[in-house]
């Protein structure tokens, strides 16, 4: 246990009220503030929440072994914005602190720390507006956040804090990038392996090139190309989301459903650029399958499953004729993925995404004879039609393209051969097909796909029935049925037909079974300044080279201008120009990569904001290690699998991770991917970063708008009758109420500092935890905070005389009365279970109920044996007050490390039991008997009950059935 100071914090300096009748030692906001400040100082000075590691700088200095019972609790760390915290932000932080404090009191070695996710676009944009360097802004914001979080009394190990912008931190972000860059995915082994092993296999002849070339005859450049194409990090000319208004590309997840940037609301355009990509798709199966191992909300698992989007089907090759002559026919295969190969006899046209890389090759120079004018987009040539169509749809989001009821498209002037029928079908481009899913080309079966039916109906294309079941002239039939109009498949059910045609395609070399995913590789470059630089340089030929690990960190240089080149938001043809390109002295370097000094240029992109948060849990385990990401012993202790505790399939990971559901896909999926690569390469022992996840709900509040829709300060609004009003420039104005988020822009934000000033931090903690289940959203109401405040005042009065400041507790020699003992131990049992299950709202309710009982039954003085357990149980919720009361009760050690009270099982069992008594199936009476009453006693008491006797009317029951502890049934 932690020794305490000899002085009593906050006690002798309590300020008397000006009202002579007021209690001098009442628990007020002022006294709460002094108590809280003093105890926070005590905890910091005495390092109360510092937790030891097995090895390294944080290991016990005396060489002792760390406790086996460990617990790693983690919050999704905050982005330190300039607005600071509002009362919605601490909800999860307080909940995890209560959880960590409870388990610390029960003897666990608890790791709970807090860092800051400090890279990102907001600081960069503010820097552009003000000329203040984003580092200065970020550091100031972090100081403010630490102050606000510090007031809440969170029991964090402050030695383990960091910001993702710290050079010592992002050195290891860059190191992880190099591990992924220098790795490849071995499909046979289903894991990542070092790229050096792949090169060795090529050198030895153990592995051959898939294109048939001889590795030994390749030039150095050709070999480098082969290897670069195998890496888990690679460059590709990919379709990206280009946002001219922000001057950068965005990941799919950073684009809204209506095709605009999530930040800034600028138009986003699909554009082909050469970008760094991470091959997350190699892990699609493992990311999907391992969800079953995780104790996560089913909603989050479903979101990840849908995002990964595994589907089974077949790849089919349609042969498109490019030219035909007497000498030869030039053809190109159009590869299509379909989940319904059984419908191939119903294919009447093909559709390619407008961005498909075959479009420019397939588009004809002239329209074929008798081309339907509706297919031409009003253009003189197919090329002109495709160009015009691409311009028309460039700003449409993927969601718009898929949900649009008005189908549009252009004929390419080419036909492809359906391998099932041997007949030609026209090839179109249309925006309802996306290049990011499957192959970016679909075989259209309008008889059995609603989107294909709409397209065929508009462009007067044939609609063929191949699944019997409905009239396809009115709408596509999407149900099950028997195959018709399908040659050798006729009469088969769907499943049988799928197997049969897939086998036929494989035998003919025109297709094969395949599993496809919606998941796309991760776009990993941003044209920004405020992010982690890439540890990549380029030679004079433009070939990338990874820096040696010894060259890390690559520090972010200071630049005079932080902005990428911004363009007209509607300029889809603009090209990105990153801010780091302006730091010419930093960009152009001379390095020796083993073949002498040569000129190189650094990569001028930066990593996305997700980079630091994809691994930060590992750094908490070993934050000062300058030699390694984290020592293996420390990672294994805090995050390694524990099959004896969690089952044989335990993947390991953080014991509890709490944060918002808005990160279900992005952050959590990326973190899982990085962690799995590190696991494959032997750097960590855990297969997953987070064993258990809980999504806290949101604290919401009312906001108010005037007649123009502008928000007005919520704290100035008052209600009169059924209306709401606030002061205006010319008197009162009516305003209109809406319910939702809390935010500065909505003018309904309440700072936790305000509540701490008015009531104290412990009151804020108790109020937020009492508002409802952690996972549920709940409305904020400042007027209700006083309820938590009064509860803490009642607890204070149980221990402290408000007039004299003396302790009211008495050391009684006798036992407590039976009812109080039973109430106490049931409270201990219930609160223990609630804390362990994060049911802090019901734990609070039980503590209030027990406090009310003591207040009512012990008006003069309270027995120590009754009040000390209350103080201990209160400690996770209101730690400052609990520490203060514990000290006033005469203890000289902190209660931060317990002991948490233990319930006596003898007081958890009822002495009596109430039985309902049925007569012929209907309850006719109730009896109360001793809990251990035997059958004969139960029968005798039931038959003697007055109400039961009325319904028996003198009859003797044929049967008396007793369901122990629940029911007595009489049958007459």
Curated annotation (Swiss-Prot):
Binding site for ATP: 744
Disulfide pattern: none
Keyword Lipid metabolism in record: no
InterPro entries: aa-tRNA-synth_I_CS, Leu-tRNA-ligase, Leu_tRNA-synth_edit, M/V/L/I-tRNA-synth_anticd-bd, Methionyl/Leucyl_tRNA_Synth, Rossmann-like_a/b/a_fold, tRNAsynth_Ia_anticodon-bd, Val/Leu/Ile-tRNA-synth_edit
GO BP term, pick one: leucyl-tRNA aminoacylation
Motif ('KMSKS' region): 741-745
Catalytic function, reaction form: tRNA(Leu) + L-leucine + ATP = L-leucyl-tRNA(Leu) + AMP + diphosphate
GO MF annotation terms: aminoacyl-tRNA deacylase activity; ATP binding; leucine-tRNA ligase activity
Motif segment ('HIGH' region): 78-89
PANTHER family: LEUCINE--TRNA LIGASE, MITOCHONDRIAL (PTHR43740:SF2), LEUCYL-TRNA SYNTHETASE (PTHR43740)
Protein name: Leucine--tRNA ligase
Gene: leuS
